[in-house]
Design a protein with these regions (language model features):
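Short coil/turn linking the two alpha-helices of tandem helical-hairpin repeats
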Residues: 121-123, 128, 167, 189-195
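Polar, glycine-rich mid-to-C-terminal structural blocks
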Residues: 191-192, 203-215
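Short acidic-aromatic linear motifs embedded in glycine-rich loops, typified by GG[WY][YF]DAGD(H)
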Residues: 1-108, 112, 117-123, 128-134, ...
């Protein structure tokens, strides 16, 4: 979220600590339920009390942090995809072997972009939609949950065969297991997102994961 601590966020107007991806996902998913209780409410984390008492509003810094962080992830993935096309790589003298590895990175970036849109769909129900084909700085159309669901599903299904097999990638990089887990989570709540249950599809992805050798 920054290189020099909470006071140097790469998101304007947002403290880096309030927009750390894993933190805000956990806060919004858990502190808003009875799964976790904050033992003190008078600390420095403004907005925690409102989350766990379900009295938050649009000014809550964790909601702003989550939305902004997810949209930044979309923007970063889009820019990586713009800068790593075969045409750009050829013009920069990148070897054929390196281009093959970069193509895998491109598909991983698409999966991370799908993750960001998943959280926007899940937490907010809508978001501005942009891909690498849109000009930088242009506000995209607002997509609702059904549109975001369709994009996430089609994107993950398209790139799934191109990702590395489960547990074969470098540490810290995603693989087919990531894509299947995100598909499973998307299908699990499909009835909420699009009004159509997809439990069979969810179970199929979970079965693939279970049989992937994880312990």
């Amino acid at each position: 979220t920054s290189t020099n601590g909470a006071s140097s966020s790469n998101l304007g107007g947002i403290d880096a600590g309030f927009s750390q991806y894993g933190r805000v996902v956990w806060y919004l998913n858990n502190l808003t339920t009875d799964e976790a209780i904050w033992s003190y409410e008078g600390g420095n984390d403004i907005g925690v009390r409102e989350l766990q008492r379900n009295i938050w509003d649009a000014s809550n810094p964790f909601f702003r942090g989550m939305f902004s962080r997810a949209m930044l992830q979309v923007a970063l993935a889009n820019e990586f995809l713009r800068q790593s096309t075969p045409e750009k790589l050829n013009s920069r003298g990148i070897s054929t072997s390196e281009q093959g590895e970069i193509q895998i990175y491109r598909n991983e970036a698409r999966a991370l972009r799908a993750l960001a849109y998943y959280h926007l769909m899940d937490f907010f129900g809508k978001a501005a939609f942009n891909t690498e084909n849109d000009a930088v700085g242009v506000a995209g159309p607002q997509y609702d949950r059904q549109q975001l669901f369709s994009f996430i599903e089609s994107e993950l299904l398209e790139i799934l065969p191109t990702l590395k097999a489960p547990r074969t990638n470098q540490y810290g990089r995603l693989d087919q297991g990531f894509a299947r887990m995100l598909l499973a989570k998307t299908y699990l709540n499909a009835e909420v997102y699009i009004g159509t249950p997809k439990y069979t599809e969810c179970a199929a992805q979970c079965t693939e994961l279970i049989n992937s050798g994880y312990t």
